[in-house]
């Protein structure tokens, strides 16, 4: 019980007859192709990019910047620009040791509101994961279907 937070990446991979570009997706279990999953029916791949536990300052940022201030455990689209902004802010918080840049928030089992080592560790980890993600995106050809990112929390 408590604040659980998820960032996911969804990549559209549906193959259309009228398109020349084709994705290839294979699902195997113990090296054997899954017969209950038809590759030609796969249209989207969902990746779990990051999971946080009781990082209420990160949650507060998503609520304020991606959810229009509404905190009802709803799923919210997160743009690449927003991810870049969050990454830069997390880095600045750690580099400047300035917790005033990213406020903690109280909530139902949201964890500590102290600006302690866990607070800074979550900022560091968030920055590192987003930077790695942005690098992965940068290396992809610009003409492929782009991914969409989503944030969701539960408690």
Where are these regions (language model features)?
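Acidic (Asp/Glu-rich) sequence patches and key acidic residues
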Residues: 1-155
């Amino acid at each position: 019980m408590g604040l659980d937070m998820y960032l996911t990446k969804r990549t559209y991979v549906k193959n259309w007859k009228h398109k020349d570009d084709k994705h290839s997706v294979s699902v195997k279990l113990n090296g054997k192709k899954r017969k209950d999953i038809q590759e030609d029916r796969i249209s989207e791949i969902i990746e779990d990019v990051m999971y946080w536990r009781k990082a209420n300052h990160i949650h507060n940022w998503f609520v304020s910047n991606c959810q229009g201030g509404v905190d009802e455990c709803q799923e919210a689209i997160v743009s690449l620009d927003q991810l870049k902004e969050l990454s830069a802010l997390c880095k600045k918080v750690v580099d400047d040791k300035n917790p005033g840049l990213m406020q903690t928030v109280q909530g139902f089992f949201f964890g500590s509101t102290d600006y302690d080592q866990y607070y800074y560790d979550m900022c560091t980890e968030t920055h590192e994961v987003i930077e790695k993600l942005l690098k992965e995106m940068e290396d992809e050809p610009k003409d492929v279907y782009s991914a969409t990112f989503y944030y969701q929390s539960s408690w």
